UniProtKB/Swiss-Prot annotation:
UniProt GO molecular function: dUTP diphosphatase activity; magnesium ion binding
Gene3D superfamilies (UniProt xref): 2.70.40.10
GO biological process, one term: dUTP catabolic process
Pathway of action: Pyrimidine metabolism; dUMP biosynthesis; dUMP from dCTP (dUTP route): step 2/2
Protein name: Deoxyuridine 5'-triphosphate nucleotidohydrolase
Region (Disordered): 132-153
Membrane-spanning segments: none
EC number from the UniProt entry: 3.6.1.23
CDD domains to which the protein is assigned, alphabetical: trimeric_dUTPase (cd07557)
Coiled coil: none
Chemical reaction(s) catalysed: dUTP + H2O = dUMP + diphosphate + H(+)
Keywords: Hydrolase, Magnesium, Metal-binding, Nucleotide metabolism
One Pfam family this sequence matches: dUTPase
Amino acid sequence: MIKVKIVRVNKKAHLPVYATAHAAGMDVAACLDEPVMLEPFSTALIPSGFAIELPEGYEAQLRPRSGLALKHLISLPNSPATIDADYRGEVRVILVNFGKEPFSVAHGDRIAQMVVSRVERVDFDEAEELSMTQRGEGGFGHTGISAVHPRTH
């Protein structure tokens, strides 16, 4: 387990917590003075009230919460959102309402999850061509939609 420095930039902030013993992501709560109404097909930048100092070689990703997505069509349009190790500002979450009804976000509502992971930096080696594979340039649905067996009609 790594240690990550965290600072409350708002004394009312709820710090991120793991909801269960084996959760990969920590719940991130809204830190608001008053509720924010998220109208259908609109976005809002929601403060968390905290800032973090990640060690070099790590990132944090903000991801949607499955319950908000399933029940209210609330998500993060830039998911996963990346927090770099050298960022020192308040963690804020962009929420989008894909639903048909307004959605109210209140102080303390768990609005996202945060996963901290190692990242590798790369040094690109420019070449004239790439090696051949069976897949080649296939992408964007080229394998079809059937999970196990080809469909029979």
